[in-house]
Amino acid sequence: MSTDIEGLPQEDINELVDETIAENEVVLFMKGTAIAPECGYSETALHHIRRHRDDVECVDILHSDEEFRAALERHSGWTTIPQAYVDGEFVGGADVLEELDERGELADALNA
């Protein structure tokens, strides 16, 4: 998914983030794409999700405006990227996904 939101008011950006989270069972807001992650944390998060599911919506926010990041923070309370959501609920970033995977709990968390 592209995040070309330049010039949109914050309310519209908030709505776009809300819709993306609501319309996808598993969504990962990351730096880069599923094919070419642009940071190690995004690559780690995607790796752990893909161990259990192939169907994940990846949203590249690398070049997004601060308003887009603010909309994400409104959902999660976190300022860091990546951020994973399952069934509309914030799960965590790379470290949380890795920990859940190591404990054998990630598959359940991802509805896999």
Model feature map: region roles:
Residues 16-55:
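Local sequence-structure signature of Cys/Sec-based thiol-disulfide redox active-site neighborhoods
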Residues 28-29, 82-87:
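Cytosolic beta-strand hydrophobic patch enriched in CBS
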